[in-house]
Amino acid sequence: MSEIIQDLSLEDVLGDRFGRYSKYIIQERALPDVRDGLKPVQRRILYAMYSSGNTHDKNFRKSAKTVGDVIGQYHPHGDSSVYEAMVRLSQDWKLRHVLIEMHGNNGSIDNDPPAAMRYTEAKLSLLAEELLRDINKETVSFIPNYDDTTLEPMVLPSRFPNLLVNGSTGISAGYATDIPPHNLAEVIQATLKYIDNPDITVNQLMKYIKGPDFPTGGIIQGIDGIKKAYESGKGRIIVRSKVEEETLRNGRKQLIITEIPYEVNKSSLVKRIDELRADKKVDGIVEVRDETDRTGLRIAIELKKDVNSESIKNYLYKNSDLQISYNFNMVAISDGRPKLMGIRQIIDSYLNHQIEVVANRTKFELDNAEKRMHIVEGLIKALSILDKVIELIRSSKNKCDAKENLIEVYEFTEEQAEAIVMLQLYRLTNTDIVALEGEHKELEALIKQLRHILDNHDALLNVIKEELNEIKKKFKSERLSLIEAEIEEIKIDKEVMVPSEEVILSMTRHGYIKRTSIRSFNASGVEDIGLKDGDSLLKHQEVNTQDTVLVFTNKGRYLFIPVHKLADIRWKELGQHVSQIVPIEEDEVVINVFNEKDFNTDAFYVFATQNGMIKKSTVPLFKTTRFNKPLIATKVKENDDLISVMRFEKDQLITVITNKGMSLTYNTSELSDTGLRAAGVKSINLKAEDFVVMTEGVSENDTILMATQRGSLKRISFKILQVAKRAQRGITLLKELKKNPHRIVAAHVVTGEHSQYTLYSKSNEEHGLINDIHKSEQYTNGSFIVDTDDFGEVIDMYIS
C-alpha cells in the first residue's frame, strides 16, 4: 500500500483543524437554533423519544433506553452528556415548561446529581409533542445520521417559540449564549401582535412580553436593561429573591425566602449566608435554616431582637446570591451562523420558520387529499358500472390482468385500478356508496381550503395564529417573576456589617497601627505595647469598631481606614504598618491619627506646615468611600512638610513656636474654612532661615515644654503667651546667645494628661517627669537636662 505524505506547516494544520472544530461545536453542540430553541443533542433526544413512541400518553420508559437510542442512532458521544441533557429538559427549576417528564431522582435545585439512568424513567411532556407535531408531514428537512443508517430532522416544527419560552445557555468557541426563559402566554401574544404588524417596535412588544419569567420566580429589576436586551440582544438586569418577614412567638423576626434567583444553587446560598453569620460579617443573624420540603422552597433566617431586618436583607442582597445580575447574551444559530439577536429578530426568524412549516404541511396534506380524491372518484365510477366491472374482473386471468383490463376498457388510472381490485365485497353496499360520495364532497372542500392557504399569505398566517392561540389557551400559566421598573440602590447600615465593640486603637510614631481588645489591653498596660527598637507610642485611645480612623502624613495626605478593617492584634504584639493597609511613599511619615464616629459634625481640622502655612477644613469633607489609596488633606508645597494636624469642636487659641524661639498665639476664628486641595494662609511671619516646630491648641491651664538642641528644657505658663493676630512675627521665648545659640527642636503643649517627657538624640534617649521642670520666664533658655557631649545633640522630644 503506497503512502501519501503531505508537507504542511504546523500553523496551517492547527489553524485548519481548530477552525473545523470551532465550526462544529458552534453549529452542532453549544448554541440553540433560533427556530426551535434546541441544541442538537436536545433535538435528538426529543426526536428519539417521539420516534420510539415514548409520548405523554404512554407509560414511562427507562431513561437508559432513550439514552441508548440517542447514542446508537443520532448522537455518537458519551452517555453521560446525553443523560445530563435529558435530565435538564425535565428540571422545572431550569426550564419554564419542562419538555420531558421524569420519574425518580432528576437532581435538585441544590445541584444534587440525578439518579443513574438505569433507575429513572421518562417520557415526553405534552408540550414537547407540540414541538414535534406534524414532523411526519414533511414539514422540516431531514438529513442522514452520522452513519447513514437513518434520517434525523435538521430542526423541529416547533409549534411555539421555544427559544424564548425556555431560554438557553451555552458556551462554544468564541461564542456564548444566555437567553432567559419567558412566559409562554406572553411570548405567544407578542408573536401574534408581530404577525399583525411586522413593523411593531420593541416598546410596543414589551406591552405583551413584560420581560423574563424565571421558573424559580424572583423579582426582576431594570426595565431599561430588558429593553436594551430586546433591542440589541445584550442587556443586564437584577434578579433578587422574594423575601418576606415573619414574627416568631418570642418576639424575634425571621426572614423567609420563598423564591431565589435563576440558576442559583440553594444549598450554596444557605451555606454562604451561614458563613457570613459565623464569620461575624453581619451582626444580627441567629440561625439560618433550610426548611424546603415538598410544599416548596423555604429558607428561614432567624434574627436577633430589635435588629433592623431591612438592613440585614440589604446586606445579604449585596454579599450573597440572594441577589444576582443576569446578563442577556441572546446568541442563536440563524441561517447556519451564530447571531446576536434582539427580540424582533428572534420572533421574525420563528415566524418565517412557521410559515415554511405550515406551507410544507399544507402541500403534504393537499397532495394526500388530491391522491385520495383521485381514488374516491375511481371507486365512485366503478360502483356506477358495478356489474360490468365485476364481470370484467371475473373474466380476467389474475389481479394484474384485471387491472390492465380496467385501465384499457374503462380508462381507469393505475392507482384507481389498484383500489378497485383491492375493494372488499362488503364495500359494495349502498351505505358505502353514500359514504364515498360524502367523502368526495369533504375532499373537495378540503382541497379548496388547502389551496386557498397556499395561494393566500394572509390565510396561511391565520392558520399560524389559530394554532398559536390553541397552544396559548391549553398551556398558559401565571407569571412567576415580578418585574420592577427601577434597579433599587442597596443601602447598608454600618451597624449591620460590623458588630459594635469597644476596642483600643494604637498608632506608633513609625506608623504601626492596630486595634486591640480591651481585655488584652487591660491585661498588659500601656508600657507593654509591642514596639520595634527606636519606636514609641504616638497615640492610643478607646474607639468603636464602627468608627473610622483618619491617619495624616507629612505629605499632606490622609488615609481613611474603618476601624473594623484594622487587624485585631494583642497589645504586646507588633501592629500592622499602615503601608500594608494603604500604600504610602517611602519617605512619608505619620504625624497624627484621629477617630471619627460621625462625619456629620461642626468639628474641623487645622493643618500647619513647617514653612508657616495654616488652614482649616471641616470634618465632613473627609468622608469618602475610597479606602485603597491616600487622599489629599491639604496642599503642601515643595520643600515643605505638614508638621501638625489638630481637631477642634469649636474655635480656640493655637500657639505657634519656631526653631529660633519665636511664638505667636491667635484664635482659629481667624481662619476661613477651605477645601481639601487648598494650601491655606500664612500662620506666622518667619525670620530668615527660621521654621515652625510646633502648632498646637492651647488653653489657660496649659503650659508649654520646649527642648533645644543643646539639651535644655524650658517650660512656660500660658500667661507668658500674648494673644495676637495671625501672620505676625510674635514674641521671643529664648535668650539669644552670640555663640552656639539655643534652637528649639521640639515643643509641646502640656495638659493635665501629660506627665513624662522623652528626649532623643541619634543614639540615646532620656526620660523624665514634666513636673520636675520648673516654669521659666520669657527670656531664658531653660535648664540643661543632658550633656550633649555624652548624650549627643537633641533632635526630638515626645511627651506622654
Curated annotation (Swiss-Prot):
Disulfide pairings: none
Name this polypeptide is given: DNA topoisomerase 4 subunit A
EC number(s) per entry: 5.6.2.2
Residues of the site described as Transition state stabilizer: 118
PROSITE patterns: TOPO_IIA (PS52040)
Subunit text: Heterotetramer composed of ParC and ParE.
Pfam families per the UniProt record, alphabetical: DNA_gyraseA_C, DNA_topoisoIV
Stored SUPFAM superfamilies: GyrA/ParC C-terminal domain-like, Type II DNA topoisomerase
Protein family according to the UniProt entry: Belongs to the type II topoisomerase GyrA/ParC subunit family. ParC type 2 subfamily.
GO biological process, alphabetically ordered: chromosome segregation; DNA topological change
TM regions (residue ranges): none
Keywords, alphabetical: Cell membrane, DNA-binding, Isomerase, Membrane, Topoisomerase
Membrane-protein topology: Peripheral membrane protein
The keyword Chaperone belongs to this UniProt entry's keyword annotation: no
